[in-house]
């Protein structure tokens, strides 16, 4: 069984990398958490921390996770035990009566009670997620805390400061009501050993689940280095990369004595760089210009001939590659999905005046700016990025790994958009599509949701994202209640694109 688990994890490592890169959750759900599942969960945690470059926290967090899984499973066992005994777990007298024999009876017949948990639909869910520069580890179960349980948790958290070591706790604390009753206190002490505190530990109720959350800082050195390198690269770039075959198409179109603007518009819609060029020159005339249609309306035929000519120093032609081809295809699909979702749902949503379907198409393309700029770095730029990373000595290889393959694209996209003087609302939207939503004005939330859904549809279709990783609240806004409905939406969008 161990070999099967390890093999499965080896296959899933790419999923873990993608989840971190796109700041998606990793979830594992179990009704009984058998031994092989515990091993699997611990291995996923180790790989997750490795990919977050926080491997030094492995031992401490593995211990904490084991304690919290036991607590969550015990909470579920307690519910079915009380129900079988005909006791009300929310009644203080019944609670006291039930807990007298709970530990002994369930320990002696645990498989029976675990099967009851399965039949009752009581689960334990582990959620791991990187959000910006913080790591979230959550244990969720669908047994809501009673008032007495909430009080006991509060008392334990308040008492932590009395103890300086686990030995001291083990020698002085014994709460027979909760078994050993040491789990929470020991978890906090373990967190303190790695420089954290009880402020990094939360217990609360959300969406009919009890949530225990540990919040960790990301690797500060790596995040600081990556942010500096993102600024440096963004400001080094003084030319817009355009895929060679796409440039040849539009270059031929603008060489015609009479410009076919519809054909030019379609060519621009196929390439991030071509769209950025149109916007660059349109912004010189109108600082609010976003959207290919709007940008083209501001540019004369002669200006288009110059913009897409060999003599324009703002252009850097790049050779196509499988990675770049996939990236451009992803951006095209995302843009098309965003365009159609906007048209389909705009009447139902409150939104900003600056938004329209053409703008959403452009934002769908521009959401891949960061990935495109990383992939099309010049040799000089790559060399300079490596030189910068080496200033961090022993961490430099990790920094380069995060810079080239991590979530750096979000930093670069945000910085480059500001540098290019993209309108603030557009910068907000492409910066907040999968994070930082609290910083977004409400009137732009519809556009962010559309962009998020469009990206996730494409990532799902590419088998990079799983359905469970998509925000349920956003799915619900669009009437998507299950995976079948989500697949149907994607199929309709793809069919529409093929027929366009």
Residue spans for each PLM region:
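Flexible ATP-lid and adjacent glycine-rich G1/G2 motifs of the Bergerat
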Residues: 104-120, 135-136, 143-202
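Divalent-cation-assisted or electrostatically stabilized phosphate/pyrophosphate-binding catalytic cores
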Residues: 293, 382-415, 439-448, 465, ...
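Conserved ATP-binding N-box helix of the HATPase_c
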Residues: 53-122, 127-130, 183-193
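Conserved alpha-helical "signature site"
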Residues: 224-366, 372-380, 401-405, 415-426, ...
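Helix-loop-beta hinge of the Bergerat
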Residues: 22-54, 147, 153-166
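Non-catalytic interface/linker regions that flank or bridge core catalytic/transmembrane domains
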Residues: 1-12, 158-175, 184-192, 198-307, ...
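Short beta-strand element(s) in the Bergerat
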Residues: 22-26, 124, 133-137, 210
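Conserved short strand/loop->alpha-helix "switch" segment adjacent to the catalytic nucleotide/phosphoryl-transfer site
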Residues: 42-66, 89-90, 172-177, 351-352
């Amino acid at each position: 069984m161990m070999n099967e688990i390890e093999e499965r994890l080896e296959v899933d490592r790419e999923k873990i990398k993608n989840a971190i890169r796109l700041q998606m959750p990793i979830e594992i759900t179990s009704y009984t958490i058998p031994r092989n599942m515990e091993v699997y969960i611990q291995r996923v945690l180790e790989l997750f921390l490795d990919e977050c470059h926080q491997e030094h926290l492995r031992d401490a967090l593995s211990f904490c996770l084991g304690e919290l899984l036991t607590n969550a499973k015990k909470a579920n066992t307690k519910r079915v035990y009380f129900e079988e005994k005909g006791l009300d777990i929310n009644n203080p007298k019944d609670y006291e009566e039930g807990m007298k024999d709970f530990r002994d009876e369930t320990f002696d017949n645990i498989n029976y009670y675990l099967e009851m948990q399965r039949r009752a639909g009581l689960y334990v869910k582990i959620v791991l997620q990187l959000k910006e520069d913080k790591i979230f580890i959550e244990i969720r179960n669908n047994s809501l805390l009673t008032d007495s349980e909430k009080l006991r948790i509060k008392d334990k958290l308040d008492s932590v400061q009395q103890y300086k070591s686990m030995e001291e706790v083990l020698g002085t604390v014994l709460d027979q009501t909760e078994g050993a009753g040491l789990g929470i206190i020991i978890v906090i002490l373990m967190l303190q050993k790695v420089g954290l505190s009880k402020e990094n530990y939360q217990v609360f109720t959300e969406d009919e689940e009890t949530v225990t959350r540990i919040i960790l800082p990301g690797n500060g050195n790596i995040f600081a280095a990556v942010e500096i390198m993102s600024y440096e690269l963004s400001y080094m770039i003084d030319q817009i990369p355009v895929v060679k075959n796409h440039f040849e198409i539009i270059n031929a179109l603008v060489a015609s004595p009479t410009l076919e603007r519809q054909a030019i518009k379609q060519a621009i819609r196929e390439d991030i760089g071509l769209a950025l060029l149109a916007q660059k020159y349109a912004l010189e005339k109108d600082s609010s210009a976003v959207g290919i249609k709007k940008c083209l309306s501001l540019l004369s035929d002669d200006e288009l001939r110059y913009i897409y000519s060999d003599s324009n120093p703002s252009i850097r032609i790049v050779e196509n590659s499988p990675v770049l081809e996939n990236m451009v295809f992803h951006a095209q699909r995302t843009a098309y999905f965003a365009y159609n979702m906007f048209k389909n749902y705009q009447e139902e949503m409150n939104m900003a005046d600056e938004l329209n379907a053409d703008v959403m198409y452009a934002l769908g393309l521009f959401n891949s700016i960061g990935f495109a700029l990383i992939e099309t770095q010049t040799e000089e730029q790559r060399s300079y990025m490596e030189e910068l990373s080496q200033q961090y000595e022993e961490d430099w290889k990790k920094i380069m790994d995060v810079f080239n393959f991590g979530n750096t694209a979000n930093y670069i996209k945000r910085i480059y958009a500001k540098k290019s003087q993209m309108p603030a609302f557009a910068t907000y939207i492409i910066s907040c599509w999968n994070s930082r939503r609290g910083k977004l004005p409400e009137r732009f939330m519809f556009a962010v949701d559309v962009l998020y859904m469009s990206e996730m549809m494409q990532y799902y279709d590419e088998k990079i994202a799983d359905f469970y990783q998509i925000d349920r609240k956003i799915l619900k806004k669009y009437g998507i209640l299950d995976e079948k409905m989500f697949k149907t939406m994607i199929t309709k969008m793809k069919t529409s694109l093929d027929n366009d």
